[in-house]
Structure formats: structure tokens, C-alpha cells
Amino acid sequence: MKKTTKKIVIVSFIILFLVVGLTIVFISPLTKYLVQKYDEKYTGREITMDWAYVNPFTGYFHFSNLKIHELKSDSLFFSSDNLKLNISLLKLISSTIEISELTLDHPIGTVIQNKNDFNYTDLIEKFMPDKLDTTVSGWRFSILKVKIEGGEIHYLENQIPINYFVKELNIESSGMQWDVDTVAGTFSFLSGIGTGSVKGDFNVNLKTKNYKYDLVVKKFDLNIIEQYMKELANYGTFRANLDADIKAIGNINDERDVTLKGMLAINDFHFGKDRTEDYLSWDKFVMAIKDLSPNKHLYIYDSVALIRPYFKYEMYDSTDNLQAMFGKDGANVSAVADDNSKFNLIIEIARTVKVMARNFFQSYYRINRLAIYDGDLKFNDFSLNEKFSAKLDPFNFIADSIDKNRTWVTASLKSGIKPFGDASVSVKINPKDTGDFDMQYNFRNISAASFNPYLISYTSFPVDRGKIELNGTWNVRNGEIKSVNHLLVIDPRVTKRVKKKHADWIPLPLIFSFIREYGNVIDYEIPITGSFKNPKFHLKDVIFDLIGNIFVKPAKTAYRMEVKEVEYDIEKSLTFKWPTLQTSILSSQKKFVNKIESFLADNPQASITIYPKQYEAKEKEYILFFEAKKKYYMALKEKGDDSFDEGDSLKVNSLSVRDTKFNNYLDNILKDTMLFTIQEKCSKLVGQSIVNFGFNKLKAARADSFKSSFKKEVLGQIKIMNGENIIPFNGFSFYKIEYSGAIPKSLQKAYEELQVLNEEAPRNKYLRGRP
């Protein structure tokens, strides 16, 4: 009996094992078959897999190399190397569907957007019931553990277009249970295009929609911005990366209901024409946030700093660099912003910033330090007959203890002005009303010659000497201005007229003679009052001063005498000016050269050293213009290089770079819409090698001309050093002449005579020179 019972048990186990085994063996391929047979019927999409393993006794499912295709397409919508899940069968008895574990191995999903439609819209429509069932189901659902390893998410937008993805996506969550409101987990991923990583943890209450998260971002590439920028800009490039360490709590249903703290930094920011030319850049923009809550109207920062910012604004003949990029008055941006059928990340960021900025000033705010360090703000004007360039560098701005509850907040700005000068501004402002502030500013040591591009274009007269200072005090209450502004131009000297077509002519020497006060100084105070909307410039005070200056010179003050003496001493250093592109010595300079020659002949042991100081940028610009105009002239006259003579050279030299026919010639030859300036067009036409050759030839010709003015007997006492390329304070290339020891009186006197210092009223000198 025992043997029979034992035998029955063994046979039963064998049968059970065979039944289970056969069930598993047959149900797995059957599952694969049924899925692939009815996939399109129930999902509208083709689903494939290498193999399936299903255990109906344990509730374990495993699909290998699962692939779900796009609707009526061979392209993949979703794939996963392995999909595994465990269903608790016993819980089904209690009307509970519980997935104890769900694992996705290297899943790849693709989201495609076309206007307002997505590539998963059909799935939502297929599985969404026609009528919402409001009856309470008796079934409960839980998923206890979710794990995603090595995933990828791709996002494609067809209109702009956008192509972006993240990789190495890892998510691990304790899941959600039917009787627990919260879901928690951790996540991490890498940038698919570029560098950088993101990791963090989250906790969401599914009932109240409250959330909290900790987020750490390291050097995450923001190049997706460049793809959205292409819809806004006619051209351009963008790159930057993000660092962040943020802790936040909030509510999903209200975007304003968020409170966060931590650090946010945008690094290595570059935006510009191309990869080599930036319009805006910075090394780091960093915010240290102590407490930020739009809903509570609270903005507290430990610091906000912008480090090494760079900004370049350029004016062209009919537009500027920003309008050339974004359309006239930002037309491209407005068009995209007004199109509600499109999503543009840049527009949405701008809208969010605008809302937060409005909320910021309506809230309590405190910033312990707001700073800009080592900035470089550049302005180029190519709309003139020659390029004007200036910049604030290094630009520094600091404001400490900015607090809305304080009566006054102070800030200071200090900057160098290049090519010459410096600026300082101090401001005391009411944080509750920006229409209340006091300001003092001072701009000093600015070279008058640096404005020669404007003077030549609008008067035809450059200056080769002079210094500008501007300072003032503003007291503003409730938007009403009371200010005194003081303009001082020290010892300006007008040089020879530049005769060019398309250049206005104004008798600048005569005007200077009217407006200069005693001591060769222009000194005026210009009060400004009124409001910001309707400021009043008290020009009548200047006019009365001008009229008085014509008939009665002000008394000679100690200050102006000191200024004159300082300027007089400055000019006692020996220099020999070279007007732009000139190689011959002027008759007025010949006397000075003869004095040097006589001194060297009388003192054989003496020697002088010449240090050429070349204004390379300006000389090369003039050479470039000449060579480009020469090409145009020769094409127009059908001439060759051999037949180009001095008369032709004079005609080319007198031709304006603003000549309409010349500009049409450049446009027709080059056919490049990305060349915005006359300098760029001429450079592409001529080539840099020809300009460099012309500049070297110019330097050699000047050296030969200078040496040929001396007798052979003294040439051994003259040494000409290698040149130095600079931006000269007085606006022209020059030779610096050094003599070992104190400068001999005879040379100093000859030099002073060369300068023709004007001790008499300059107006009288100008009038005497007229017929």
C-alpha cells in the first residue's frame, strides 16, 4: 500500500511537472503569436519581439527585444532589450492588480510633434473611452517597484525642426500603491547631444498634487536652445551649459506655488553670428538662492553675479547686428510669439522670466550682492566713412545689501574706456520707487581723436590733439530731474581737412574758435531738468555762453592755467606725426628734421633712436579701401595694372566708399548676404595678403623717407627700431624720438615750433588766414 501511494505521488508530481512545463513551453510562444497577430487590430501598430517567456503560475512575464512601431510605419516608436514584470496572482482574488516589479532594460522611446499633434495621439484616442465611466470600480491597482536602466528618450519636432535626446536614463521608484498617496524615486540621465549629467530624487502626492525634489545638474549642454533659435533668427549660433543644485517644493496644479533654494549657474555662454564671432557671451552667470517663492512674494538671494560678460553692438548702413539677426524691430521673434500653433522653448522661457520679473518687483526682495565682474561692452559703427570702435573694458558693477525695505540702496560702476579713458558712476536709489535716485558720474581722459570717424564724416576735419571729460550730478525725485552736466574738452586741435565725397563739410576750426574759452579749452555746463518722459535740455545757457565767448573771453582762472601747462608739458616729448597713408615729410616737419641733423653733425658722439608707433588698424583700413576702390575703378575703366598711373591714384583716393555705384559693384561681385559692412566686403574682394603687403610697403617707405632727409654723414647716428602697432591717443601713426639724457634745448625749441602751439585766440588766427 505504501509503495502504491508513493508511486501515485511520484506519478502525480511528474504529471504536474509536465503539465506546468508544457503549459509554460506552449503558452510563451502562444503569447508571442497572439501579440503579433492582433497587435494592429487592438493598437494600430506593429509589435514584434524575439521571444516571450510567460509563467502563468507565478505571474512572471519577460519579453525580449520588444519593438513597437509607429502608426503605419517601419519606424520605431518604442523598443526595449528586455521588459520584465511580476504580477501577484494571489492578490487578484481580492480584486487587486499588483505588479510587484517592472523592469525595462535599455528602453528607447521617441516622441514626435507636428504642430499640436503627437505620435502617441492615436493611442490616447484608441484607448480613451467615448464616455467617461463615473462608477467606482471594485478593482485596485498597485505597482511596487519600477526600474528603468540605460534608457533613451528622443524628441523630434518637424516644423522648426528639433532633434534632441537624453541617454543613460535610469529611474528607480518604490512605485505606487492603491492605499498610499505618495510616489517617490530617484532618476539620472546624460545629455544625448553634448556633455553633462542630471540626477535627483522626487516625491509626489498623487492626491494633493504636492511635490518636492532635489536636483543636481553638472555641465549639462544647452544646445537644444540653438535648435529653437533657428526659428527666431536669420542666422546665428548658441552654446552654453548648466550647473544646478536645487531643492524645491510646490504643487503641480499651480506653477506659482513653488519654493526653492540652492544654486543655479549658466556657464560658457556664447551667442553670435557664428562659432568665431560672439554678440553676447559670459564665463558664468550664477545665482545663490536662499529662498524663492512667487506665491509668497519672496525673493531672497545671497548673491547674483555675472562674470566676464561680453556684448557687441554694431551699426551698419541701414540696420544693426541684432536686427539683421532677428528682423527689423525683432519681427521674427514677434511672429513666432504670436503663433499659438507652435511651441518654442525660448519664447516660453522669456514669458516665464517676464512674469517672474513683474512678480519680483511686486514682492519683497533682498540680494546681499549683485555684481558684474570684468565685463567687455563693445560698440562698432560701420555706417560712417570709416569704422568707429569703443568699448567699456574692464566693466565692473557692484551693489551690496539690496533690500526692498531699506530706504536707499547704493551701487557703483567703474570701467575703463578703450581705446582711452575711464568712467565711474555711483548711484543711490530708492528700492521701492526707482523714480527716486541720486547719481554722480565722471568720464575722464577720453581721446578727442578717437571720434575722428564722426568728425570726418560730418565735418571733414579730424583732430590730432585733445582730451574730453564729462561729469555731472543728477537728483531725481518722483521722476523729476534736476541735474548739472559738465563738458570739458581740453586743448583740441583741428588738423588738415580730409576731402572726400559723401562727407559733410562744416568749418570746424571756426566753430572751435567760437566755443573755446581761454586756454584752448571747451568748458560748458548743461543743466537737464523735467521728467524722464519729457526732459528739458537747457541749451539756452550754452548759447548765451557761446555768445559771450565770441565777444568777451572769460577771466583766466588758475584751473585753466594749470590745464594749459599740463598739456604743454605733455607735448614736450619728441614725436613725429605721420598722417594716414602719408610717406613724404611735410615742409613744416622739414625744419625740425634739419635741426636734428645739425645737432647730430655738431655732436658726433650723440645718437637718436626712432621707435615707430603704427596705427595699424586705421592704416590697414585705408589701404583696404584704396585697393578695393582701385579694383572697381580699373574694372570700370577697363585698365590693367601697368596702365594705372598717379592721376588714376588720385581719382581712386577721392572716391568715397559710400559711392552707390561702388557699393553695387561689391554686391554684384561678392553675392554674399552675410557681409554687412563695407570693411567685410572690401576684405573679401581684396584679400588680407594685399593689405599686409601694402602696410609693410608703407612702413618701409616712411623709414626711407625719414632717413633720406638726413645727410649720409649722420645716418650712422640714427637707429630705427622695429615698429609697434598701437592705437595712438592723438589718432595718427608717429615716430617716437628718444635721446639718451635730457633733450637738448635746440631740439626742444625746434619741436615746439613744429607743433605751432596756439597761445593767441584761435579765432583770430583762423580769420587772418582768410582772404
Language-model segment annotations:
Residues H106, E152, K219, I266-D268, ...:
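Transmembrane beta-strands of outer-membrane beta-barrel pores
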Residues K2-F13, L292-H297, D302, F361-Y365, ...:
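Extended terminal
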Residues N65-S173, L206, K273-A288, P294-P394, ...:
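Secondary-structure transition motifs
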Residues E125-Q159, D181-G192, N251, E255, ...:
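Solvent-exposed beta-strand/coil patches in large extracellular/periplasmic or lumenal scaffold regions
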